[in-house]
Amino acid sequence: MSVSSKTSHYDPFRGESSREIALECVVATFIAIAWCNSIELVVLCFTTFKRYGGCYFWSLVIASISIIPFALGYALLIFKIFPSYFSVALEVVGWWGMVTGQSMVLWSRLHLVVHSRRILRWTLIMIIVDAILFHVPASVLEFGAHSNHQDQFNPAFDIFERVQLVAFSVQEIVLSVIYAWAAVEMLKLMPRGQYKGILIHLLVINFVMISMDAVVVGMQYAGFFRLHVSLKAMFYSVKLKMEYAILGRLVHVAAVPVHPLSSYTPTDRSSSVSRI
């Protein structure tokens, strides 16, 4: 169902119930937090990294910047400030960059703990194929849902919107699970007690990220549309901020030699760090 049909009851010039006003305040708060986090993330990208290059850096930059048009587009639509194709285009472009950018961030950091070229290649193919299969049809359906023929597009868009959300959530979960598995394997190579706290912390962060995806999907299927889209923007900004906590610890662990019998040498680790 299109945003316009889901929010047709909203009139900023009419008195609203206390519950409705509270809901709109919550939505506005989530969007504001997402914007603040996005600006902070962009600043961190250009002040934290010594070298402006590499897949990890540019994925972080694109994903961070994309939160702004995504949240802005939906704010214009939800509050009927400027319900037009321009607003739809803003949130569609932002959604592409935010979601696929986040997946590319997750994929890029796999290089620090995953050393199988086959796994890295197939996970990258998964991201590319999913982007084509889900972003393109969803974008076409969404523009159609805001056209003069919205009755023809609304049913298909309502279904596909949920399908793509689940698909991208599963994609991020797959990347997080692969990372968690590889991190545990690395943990087994460490001397007993050494760096366990760091790796456990990384696993907890990944669990929190997966939980955020589950909450977003649940809100979508429960029908809380406005809360869902605003919470989605905020959660993606929070997940990207958590990446900075992961980055420092991953580089620290991956650059340190492990058990002397391990076939993965410190030199290999240094090259993995430089590749992200």
Role assignments for model-derived ranges:
Residues 24-34, 84-99, 138-139, 155-175, ...:
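Extracellular loop 3-seventh transmembrane helix
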Residues 184-193, 253-254:
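Juxtamembrane membrane-water interface segments of multi-pass membrane proteins
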Residues 67-81, 133-149, 177-183, 208-227:
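Helix-to-loop junction signature of class
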Residues 1-2, 251-276:
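Intrinsically disordered, low-complexity terminal tails of fungal membrane proteins
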Residues 110, 114, 118-180:
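Membrane-proximal helix-loop-helix units in multi-pass membrane proteins
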